[in-house]
Amino acid sequence: MPNRAAAHASGSGKQSGAYKEIVEWIKALVIAVVLVFLIRQFLFSPFIVDGPSMQPNFETGERLIVNKIIYAIREPKFGEVVVFDVPEQDRKFIKRVIGVPGDTIRLEGDDLYINEKKIDEPYIKEAIEAAHAKGELYNLAGPDSNFPNSSNQEMTVPEGAIFALGDNRRNSSDSRVIGFVTDDEVVGRADIIFWPLNKLEFIKHWTK
C-alpha cells in the first residue's frame, strides 16, 4: 500500500507539473500575441510595395517596416518616404514628402520648385540624367504630370497636410492627382527594407 500511494503521489506531481507548464506556455503565447498587436497597432507595421510608382528606389514585392510613432512626435519632413491611406481607393500608397504646411509647390517637367526655389532631388538624379541623355523628360508631359494642373490648382500646402510625389514621376498617382494628404491619413515613415534579404537596409531620407 505505501508503494502504491507513493506511485500515485508521484504521478499526480507529474501531471500537476505538466499542467503548470502548459499554463505558462499559454500565458507566454497570449502575451506575445498582445505585444505583436500593440506593436503593429501603435509602433511599427509591415508594408508591401505594390506597383512601379517609387522606382527606381523601391520595387514591387519589397517588404518594409513602417515607423508609426515618429509623426506623433514631430511633423513629416521633405524627402521622407511615407505610407498613407487613400480612403477613396481603400488602399495604402507609398510616396515621398515634397511639401509641408506653408510650402508653395510647382513642378514643371523635371524641375521642382518649393517657394519658388529650384530644388535638387538626389533620390532621382540618375534617373533624370538617364532620361535627358536620351533627349527625354523623366516626368512625361501630360494633363496631370505637372503641378498645379486642372485636377489640383491649389499650390500652397495647408495646415495638417503634406504634398507627396512618387519617385517614378512618369507613372505615379500622387498629390498631383489625389491632392494633399492629411495628417490623419499618414500611417508612418518607411524606415527599413527587410525583404528580400539581399536588399536589407535602412531607408535613406533626403533633405533639402
Set out the residue ranges of the language-model regions.
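Hydrophobic membrane-insertion alpha-helices, especially the h-region
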Residues: K27-F42
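Soluble "head" domains of membrane/secretory-pathway proteins
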Residues: P2-I22, L38, F47-I48, P56-K208
